Amino acid sequence: MPAPIRLRELIRTIRTARTQAEEREMIQKECAAIRSSFREEDNTYRCRNVAKLLYMHMLGYPAHFGQLECLKLIASQKFTDKRIGYLGAMLLLDERQDVHLLMTNCIKNDLNHSTQFVQGLALCTLGCMGSSEMCRDLAGEVEKLLKTSNSYLRKKAALCAVHVIRKVPELMEMFLPATKNLLNEKNHGVLHTSVVLLTEMCERSPDMLAHFRKLVPQLVRILKNLIMSGYSPEHDVSGISDPFLQVRILRLLRILGRNDDDSSEAMNDILAQVATNTETSKNVGNAILYETVLTIMDIKSESGLRVLAINILGRFLLNNDKNIRYVALTSLLKTVQTDHNAVQRHRSTIVDCLKDLDVSIKRRAMELSFALVNGNNIRGMMKELLYFLDSCEPEFKADCASGIFLAAEKYAPSKRWHIDTIMRVLTTAGSYVRDDAVPNLIQLITNSVEMHAYTVQRLYKAILGDYSQQPLVQVAAWCIGEYGDLLVSGQCEEEEPIQVTEDEVLDILESVLISNMSTSVTRGYALTAIMKLSTRFTCTVNRIKKVVSIYGSSIDVELQQRAVEYNALFKKYDHMRSALLERMPVMEKVTTNGPTEIVQTNGETEPAPLETKPPPSGPQPTSQANDLLDLLGGNDITPVIPTAPTSKPSSAGGELLDLLGDINLTGAPAAAPAPASVPQISQPPFLLDGLSSQPLFNDIAAGIPSITAYSKNGLKIEFTFERSNTNPSVTVITIQASNSTELDMTDFVFQAAVPKTFQLQLLSPSSSIVPAFNTGTITQVIKVLNPQKQQLRMRIKLTYNHKGSAMQDLAEVNNFPPQSWQ
């Protein structure tokens, strides 16, 4: 049989192929020759054939038939054969294939070989693809090589030990004695790998972390020697001595100093020295400075040192390299909550990043800009962010508009400024705002009594001939319906009033009704606005009747139903029309400690509940009717029942005008005292369960299995169930939240929503902190009334802070045991 071609010739031949098909033909031909050689047990050219097979594997062609040949090469006594065999094993084998277990004995023999290079090959292979079984069998040999005096083997053994610990964490203590002397080594390779090993052990075990904290002075001394040493050609990179080792030591110091005052104090001086002495003209220096900043911000460092770190990030923002600017913005975003004033000094530079061409930098700059907004700079920051909203790409508009809404609501210097800002957003990016923007703005306008004339005039001007921004048109239609009389009378004092007739107002609302751009919801707003104007205008009532009657035969069912109801109001209940269509009362939002909305899985938003304060005296029949006619839309999610009954005024004629069905919102519990003079609507019996001192639960709870409702990112939520004695329709769910990560989860908030056929009562949690390492749990009780015995479903939302970041997640719970609801 002729000698096979060499690897170099194969590469040259393959590169001459002009098409993919021609290349495949060459590969298949060579693979056939290699298979034939393997079948004939040709030991002479086995090494050459496996090398060619590895090249084909790198090109993406199948090479699995060479796995056993790699094992044969590993068993060979020739170093060249072993080298190719081990390389082939690392490329073609992994722990999912049983073939790799056949290597265990060969690797063990080679770990005890007299030649260091053979031992090095075995260590590399074990550290690359060793399974847990192999690691368990060979850990003793690795630990022995970790204690050898040979630096070449010690650095490889340290990295192999890292892999062993990752695969078999319980073997960690085996390597503890050997690691103590690793930091005394002068060889930088050994130092580097030993720091990697120490880092892995500290991250995986709190006991190891506490044990190695006493090494902080030694690590500080090594780092100081690196930055103070002179030129060393062996380790120098762009004028900096071994930056890779410096970065590794800084990362280990960050882990050791976290939540420990003594360790942090010991490393403060060296961190300041690194931050001030490192050259920033080259990227190598910037990498070290970045790690230094992360370490300073993560440990309990001095305030002056933290300011120095933030100033370094501020200098990064001026760098021409986009990657450096991006990491600076990301780091500032993480630290802005703890060092707000120091970050504020770089506000102008951050705002300039909004004009960057890179979309990633632009997004980070936008997020950081919103984090910097406060009551002192709200006007200037909003000016910049509104300019950004005008010119940014469509993918930014939704987040930017949402951020402006939240900032304006929190820091608005005046109601007029607040209204103007939101109207500017709706005019610029109305089609990108969240669903709750419209009711929130309406609530703001309603509460600003002195701004009604100004607002309705501004909105009227804003939608003249332009209906493209539907949320803006909806708010304008609502305001014109409520305050159209102020628009016509020209009572605006804040700016020059305009002359508008009743017919002109109706013209624009009718234009909204017939516009192709108007959605069904917008048409509903417009039709209701026209109906409300029948009590505010005097000369156009007949025209309003005609418009309403026309839409009584609309193909839009929602619009048709409204028109029919309004026609009935004209014909049968005209004497009640003025009272039913009077102005909306002041609306107040509920204030909760948790988030104010639940973002649904389809991306829509469920607004937070509105709490209506009880009237000062006596029933008020018109208020309920007005609420029913406040056609802002309903929801099919049931409310969270308060722990104390709330008052609800009786309504005369409200049932006739229930145009929406139940208006149900979900949110956190909120109690409102009820005046004695207001008649009460009876609440479900389970509302008083929490106030009773009698045993409320029967023995069937013992047969209800608990479930895991959520398990992700170390957070686990478990549900246990009990059934009420007094009312079998009530299921009491106790949630237990546990945290398996190494850091506490703070500001924990659990929210839940159930379908409309259920009623839900969410009691207060036992705490807002979920302790780390499963050392404690948060408990919270949910009571669910299920009178129809339907299958229980629940949507939950979890929000908490972890590792300095705000976390939020949604989940659907559909695996409730039948015993909990049948």
From Swiss-Prot:
UniProt keyword list: Coated pit, Cytoplasm, Cytoplasmic vesicle, Disease variant, Golgi apparatus, Intellectual disability, Membrane, Protein transport, Transport
- Kindly indicate whether the keyword Membrane belongs to this entry: yes
What is the recorded phenotype of mutating R15Q? In USRISD; does not rescue morphological defects in a zebrafish animal model
Highest taxon listed in the record's lineage: Eukaryota
Q: Name one GO biological process term.
A: positive regulation of natural killer cell mediated cytotoxicity
User: Mind telling me which SMART domains this protein's record contains?
Assistant: Alpha_adaptinC2
Residues of the region (Disordered) are: 597-628
Q: Does the keyword Transferase apply?
A: no
Q: Which Pfam families does the entry link to?
A: Adaptin_N, Alpha_adaptinC2
What is an example of a GO molecular function annotated in this UniProt entry? collagen binding
How does the entry describe its membrane topology?
Answer: Peripheral membrane protein
Residue span, GAE domain: 702-817
What's an example GO cellular component term for this entry? Answer: perinuclear region of cytoplasm
Tissue and organ expression note: Widely expressed.
Q: Where in the cell is it found?
A: Golgi apparatus; Cytoplasmic vesicle, Clathrin-coated vesicle membrane; Cytoplasm; Cytoplasm, Perinuclear region
Q: Which InterPro entries has this protein been placed in? A: Adaptor_Complx_Large_Subunit (IPR050840), AP1_complex_gsu (IPR017107), ARM-like (IPR011989), ARM-type_fold (IPR016024), Clathrin/coatomer_adapt-like_N (IPR002553), Clathrin_a/b/g-adaptin_app_Ig (IPR008152), Clathrin_app_Ig-like_sf (IPR013041), GAE_dom (IPR008153)
In terms of PROSITE patterns, this protein maps to: GAE
Q: Which disease is it linked to?
A: Usmani-Riazuddin syndrome, autosomal dominant: A neurodevelopmental disorder characterized by global developmental delay with impaired intellectual development and speech delay, hypotonia, and behavioral abnormalities. More variable additional features may include seizures and distal limb anomalies.
The family assignment reads: Belongs to the adaptor complexes large subunit family.
Q: What does this protein do?
A: Subunit of clathrin-associated adaptor protein complex 1 that plays a role in protein sorting in the late-Golgi/trans-Golgi network (TGN) and/or endosomes. The AP complexes mediate both the recruitment of clathrin to membranes and the recognition of sorting signals within the cytosolic tails of transmembrane cargo molecules.
Which PANTHER family does this UniProt record tie to the protein?
A: ADAPTIN, ALPHA/GAMMA/EPSILON (PTHR22780)
Protein name in the entry: AP-1 complex subunit gamma-1
At the highest ranks, the source species' classification is: Eukaryota, Metazoa, Chordata, Craniata, Vertebrata
